[in-house]
Design a protein with these regions (language model features):
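Accessory C-terminal helicase-associated subdomains
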Residues: 39, 59-62, 104, 130-247, ...
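Conserved short internal alpha-helix adjacent to the catalytic or cofactor-binding core
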Residues: 5, 58-65, 70-104
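Helicase P-loop NTPase motor core
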Residues: 1-63, 86-90, 122, 144, ...
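C-terminal accessory regions
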Residues: 260-357
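Conserved helicase core region in the C-terminal RecA-like lobe
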Residues: 46, 99-106, 219-268, 280-304, ...
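A polyampholytic, Gly/Pro-enriched intrinsically disordered region
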Residues: 17, 83-105, 340-356
């Protein structure tokens, strides 16, 4: 931080409000301190945390870059999920069909897909309809069963479109297709991150339902499409930087936000029972603090669902309260988006004393 300037500690209700608070503080810094978007870095412990931040930035028209990874909606597992949803809304979407017909793996190879393409052209049928008659293509046994299962899932959820809202439909779909089970049961480290991203995607759908209680799947897909299209209009160089704390090593920015400062998230739960791992997390927190040339914002939420359960974090990170009290200025924030109050009036920051309770 600048000489004598305290670190801002911002309390929010949940991750939606946390992202909204970042946008609010960032816009205030730009207006009052005449900063550029490129002056800011938003740091987080795990990649899946970027989703709520990206959504808030896109809605506010704030350009950003992801360092050391893909933007949330460009990650393969998320594109696969959106492919499923697009196919359910429009079963004639052959591009989405080819993308997801063997996701999760169900033994449908490219040769089988090619047979379906040829059969659809020959019979002048939609490709999705061909899946229901595998015997006409000489496909039998497990592959025939897999094609029929996939066809029945798409047909079932297409017929459920008028009956279920987006949240209900998406949650039922990821369970029935086995997407959640596939990633959760995998021992590969990259699949654990993909599982976290899928669960974060579901949280994004839940947030859409809060904003749009009667919203259907088509409306949700329109919003995702609109938000991702906005990226193409942004200045390539003047962008906010989003990245994990690990990716931030060696970089410096005038203003740094460290988000998700709750025990169990930062430090991670897996580090709480090991002195060595906890010390490594503490060093990572120090790395985050020292990325800032002028100003640091420390962010935490009172409620944040853990991946794969309804359990909440909510305990402020021990790293925050290991810092000298006179170096912190606690700021409660109330989101204009949710209208939830955590001290203060909607849409403003309210300074309060730091308490060690």
């Amino acid at each position: 931080n600048g000489a004598g300037e305290k670190l801002a500690l911002i309390e929010t209700n949940d991750e939606m409000e946390e992202a909204d608070a970042v946008v609010n503080a960032l816009e205030k810094e730009i207006k009052l301190q005449k900063r550029n978007f490129s002056d800011f870095a938003i740091l987080y412990r795990t990649n899946s945390q970027s989703r709520s931040l990206e959504d808030a930035f896109r809605r506010s028209g704030i350009p950003y870059n992801i360092v050391g990874g893909f933007r949330f909606y460009e990650r393969k597992e998320i594109k696969d999920l959106i492919g499923y949803l697009s196919l359910i809304v429009n079963p004639k979407d052959t591009i989405s069909l080819r993308r997801v017909i063997n996701f999760p793996p169900r033994g449908i190879g490219m040769k089988t897909v090619d047979k379906c393409v040829i059969q659809a052209a020959k019979k002048k049928m939609e490709m999705v309809e061909v899946l229901s008659i595998p015997e006409d293509m000489g496909i039998r046994g497990k592959q025939a069963d897999s094609l029929m299962t996939f066809y029945n899932i798409i047909k079932k959820y297409n017929e459920l479109l008028p009956k279920l809202n987006a949240g209900e439909l998406v949650r039922a779909l990821v369970e029935e297709t086995g997407i959640i089970r596939y990633f959760r049961e995998s021992s590969a480290p990259e699949d654990q991150e993909r599982f976290a991203n899928v669960m974060e995607f579901l949280k994004g759908v839940d947030e859409f339902m809060i904003r749009t209680p009667d919203g259907g799947l088509s409306q949700y897909l329109e919003e995702v499409s609109l938000l991702t299209d906005l990226d193409q209009w942004n200045d390539e160089t003047n962008r906010v930087t989003l990245m994990t704390l690990h990716s931030s090593k060696g970089l410096e920015f005038p203003v740094v936000f460290i988000t998700g400062l709750e025990d169990g998230l930062f430090p991670l739960y897996s580090a709480l029972e090991s002195v060595e791992k906890l010390e490594e997390e503490r060093r990572l927190f120090y790395v985050g603090l020292t990325r800032a040339m002028k100003k640091v914002y420390l962010m935490y939420a009172n409620h944040r669902r853990r991946i794969g359960s309804d359990e909440l974090y909510g305990m402020v990170s021990r790293f925050v309260y290991e810092m000298p009290e006179d170096k912190l200025e606690k700021i409660s924030f109330t989101s204009a988006l949710t209208r939830k109050v955590v001290g203060g009036r909607p849409g403003i920051f309210t300074k309060t004393a730091v308490s060690r309770t």
